[in-house]
Regions:
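Positively charged, small/polar-rich N-terminal and surface patches that mediate targeting and assembly
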Residues: 1-112
Length: 112
């Protein structure tokens, strides 16, 4: 199993979720996060005063998939979340040692 962590622009969430459903990915976790990379924040004007926003709001998606589904999941997120502009996000893939569905005690691939 793999844990796929994707950091994307918030307005891309629905499109990414729908695309993942289309390839059979049934669940994901979403968290609101803030961060910076090459984008390095931006300036905004509020009530006539300019403010520097150091951290950019993003969404973090966490998806556990079977090994056989990892490449297609990453490819789908990348294709759908891409705008071609700085700040599109990142995708990380890490191994998952075990999974357990609490309600049924199903384990590993059966639990996801």
């Amino acid at each position: 199993m793999k844990l796929i962590i994707a950091v994307i622009k918030p307005f891309k969430l629905e499109e990414v979720r729908d695309a993942l459903k289309d390839i059979g990915i049934q669940g994901l976790m979403v968290s609101e996060v803030k961060g910076y990379g090459r984008q390095d924040g931006h300036s905004e004007v509020y009530r006539g005063a300019e403010y520097t926003v150091s951290f950019v709001p993003k969404l973090k998606l966490e998806i556990v998939v079977a090994d056989k589904d990892a490449s297609k999941t990453v490819e789908t997120i990348s294709e759908v979340a891409k705008t071609g502009k700085i700040g599109d996000g990142k995708i990380f893939v890490t191994p998952v040692e075990a999974a357990l569905r609490i309600r049924t005690d199903e384990k590993n691939d059966d639990a996801i």
